[in-house]
Amino acid sequence: MTLSPYLQEVAKRRTFAIISHPDAGKTTITEKVLLFGQAIQTAGTVKGRGSNQHAKSDWMEMEKQRGISITTSVMQFPYHDCLVNLLDTPGHEDFSEDTYRTLTAVDCCLMVIDAAKGVEDRTRKLMEVTRLRDTPILTFMNKLDRDIRDPMELLDEVENELKIGCAPITWPIGCGKLFKGVYHLYKDETYLYQSGKGHTIQEVRIVKGLNNPDLDAAVGEDLAQQLRDELELVKGASNEFDKELFLAGEITPVFFGTALGNFGVDHMLDGLVEWAPAPMPRQTDTRTVEASEDKFTGFVFKIQANMDPKHRDRVAFMRVVSGKYEKGMKLRQVRTAKDVVISDALTFMAGDRSHVEEAYPGDILGLHNHGTIQIGDTFTQGEMMKFTGIPNFAPELFRRIRLKDPLKQKQLLKGLVQLSEEGAVQVFRPISNNDLIVGAVGVLQFDVVVARLKSEYNVEAVYESVNVATARWVECADAKKFEEFKRKNESQLALDGGDNLAYIATSMVNLRLAQERYPDVQFHQTREH
């Protein structure tokens, strides 16, 4: 049975994101993936070491200075017979809220681990988010050109700490200065590593068969024998790869390599296009939407300001769930119940924009947004339903924001509301005074906000400490009890950027007391958009 042209396009798509701890090599691996997808000709110098060519996926001013990917950009490239969409996730310690939401828009994740360090804190947090939807995970053990921990130990650590079985696909031969290459367990082939070839795709020499004398000649008798001994252990002690268990999020195929040396990345990509799922069904408040449906649906998971400094615009990133986008089509924005004609949607190669004529499930569209689109918005061809599972997370850090020039209050508020709509920060306006309180998940977000207020809104602002420990969104089914709660707690209530009521607690004890005193009021740690 041949698939219709539409279903063939759906079957070709693979949409994934990379999760890692900062400095595990995520930006480098992103570049090498794009290199294999022929999206860039030579891999850029990461963090622009003495050069102007910044890593292709890091592009806001502050990122240029700090060498971190603050924003979540999207890159599409062909690989074998597939079209791959890579959603770049902010790799720095602080950008978790955006990163969490990006993970709601992918069908698969690549976990990058620094093989010298093993599982790190950030990796744990991001894995927890992928667990909410049992997202399939591939694993790349990076930095084999340095001295690493024992590979068996690394697998044990992933299994014990992240509660996912490991199925090694490739196995390293030596490491650091002695790194010779990897052996592919399922193809019975050894791929030999050459150093100093990291910027281009290299011709790799392949030795067939584990007992081939050419292997001993290529890597030395000692390393060849060590490899054979280790593989006996590996085959006895680790999981075999099983595609169904992988798709259920229960085991992860593990690849070894060095992103900087551009070695092993293609093995991982081969596995990704072969095993990762095509666009998956998604839940709405009324039903499940299948990718094969012919009516268009999609949801917004991120809003990005000023992707292009020359254009003062914002772009809403929308994941296509079903149907085909065609230029000029009319879509219903469910939240406002308004129909809009989308004639200028964008697709991305980070930093470069091009207009899209058509897009399919799994693809990410950029919609020009002049303040009318919010995170979590659903677009359909008329059906009134809303995709679920795109949350806001209660901030953990708070500052009061103050203007250097009091006359610019209006611009400040506008800037903060826009920044909160795109998820860069959350803003709370206390009901009882004129303060503006900014909430974030990590400290660096505060710096980003001040820098962006200055460059985009021409507003100079400074922070002051504020006596706020946490915030919870509040609601109550009983209107009378809710009125009483609001009356008695006015000094601790605030409206967020979307005018939702929140309780601002001065301490965790204060929050617990309020929850005990008002059992009918619900205090929410996350809020569905």
Swiss-Prot record:
Its main location: cytoplasm. SUPFAM superfamilies: EF-G C-terminal domain-like, P-loop containing nucleoside triphosphate hydrolases, Translation proteins. GTP binds at residues 20-27, 88-92, 142-145. Residues 11-280 form the tr-type G domain. This is Peptide chain release factor RF3. The keyword Nucleotide-binding applies. It comes from the Bacteria. GO terms for cellular component: cytosol. Belongs to the TRAFAC class translation factor GTPase superfamily. Classic translation factor GTPase family. PrfC subfamily. Increases the formation of ribosomal termination complexes and stimulates activities of RF-1 and RF-2. It binds guanine nucleotides and has strong preference for UGA stop codons. It may interact directly with the ribosome. The stimulation of RF-1 and RF-2 is significantly reduced by GTP and GDP, but not by GMP. It comes from Escherichia coli (strain K12). It is found in: Cytoplasm. GO terms for molecular function: GDP binding; GTP binding; GTPase activity; guanosine tetraphosphate binding; translation release factor activity, codon nonspecific; translation release factor activity, codon specific. InterPro entries: EF-G-like_DII, EFG_III/V, G_TR_CS, P-loop_NTPase, PrfC, RF3_C, RF3_dom_3_sf, RF3_GTP-bd. Keywords: Cytoplasm, GTP-binding, Nucleotide-binding, Protein biosynthesis. GO terms for biological process: maintenance of translational fidelity; regulation of translational termination; translational termination. NCBIfam families: prfC, PRK00741.1, small_GTP.
